[in-house]
Amino acid sequence: MAATTCFFFLFPFLLLLTLSRAATFEIVNRCSYTVWAAASKGDAALDAGGRQLNSGESWTINVEPGTKGGKIWARTDCYFDDSGRGICRTGDCGGLLQCKRFGRPPTTLAEFSLNQYGKDYIDISNIKGFNVPMDFSPTTRGCRGVRCAADIVGQCPAKLKAPGGGCNDACTVFQTSEYCCTTGKCGPTEYSRFFKRLCPDAFSYVLDKPTTVTCPGSSNYRVTFCPTALELEDE
């Protein structure tokens, strides 16, 4: 009886401790080329905000519970000086190595909000285009991962091809309400259908059918760039 009473007394504190723990994100580059990983919540960096990852390297960051609207992405073809200032052909975030804001399209985005009423919400988005294949999966149990690893760049419609590489979203290219959904009312287009056909688990436009995955609060995650390269290597 005493043990049961003690458990019920401690349970709220144990639950609070679990939900107040920072989530661990392991960011892995399995591409054959160097990428510059970035992590931001739009108005501030997440952890250090960015880091160069050569092929096969990884970077682990801690993200505070309650974080909303966090994003992780890869930048390509970057140059930075010793002060951490420079430029990237895709995903550039104001010329900084350590991103404080989101990157410039095209970018494949791993998006998340943590510990929202005890749940985490994760997704991959092509709403800002596509530059690097990606897998976004939990490393703890309780939910599935999502992936967008198709050859979108190779099959990109001519009008969406980005000069610096990658495949732009239609809103970035055409800047119309049809593609940007500025009125709050829009449907799929030929371009969003292109992204959806190749990556059905990823958001293809603002009002896309729900593709968010719900995970237990305080889960840990892994974001892998070029995940199929890892699978081929392991065969």
Swiss-Prot record:
Pfam families associated with the record? Thaumatin
Disulfide feature: C31-C226, C78-C88, C93-C99, C143-C215, C148-C199, C156-C167, C171-C180, C181-C186
Location (main, coarse): cytoplasm
- Proregion residues are 230-235
Q: Does the keyword Disulfide bond apply?
A: yes
> Which stretch is the leader sequence?
1-22
| GO CC annotation | cytoplasmic vesicle
Q: Which Gene3D superfamilies match?
A: Thaumatin
Localization terms from the record: Cytoplasmic vesicle
The alphabetized UniProt keywords are:
Cytoplasmic vesicle, Disulfide bond, Signal, Taste-modifying protein
The UniProt similarity line reads: Belongs to the thaumatin family.
Say what the protein does.
Taste-modifying protein; intensely sweet-tasting. It is 100000 times sweeter than sucrose on a molar basis.
What's the protein here called? Thaumatin II
* Source organism of the structure: Thaumatococcus daniellii
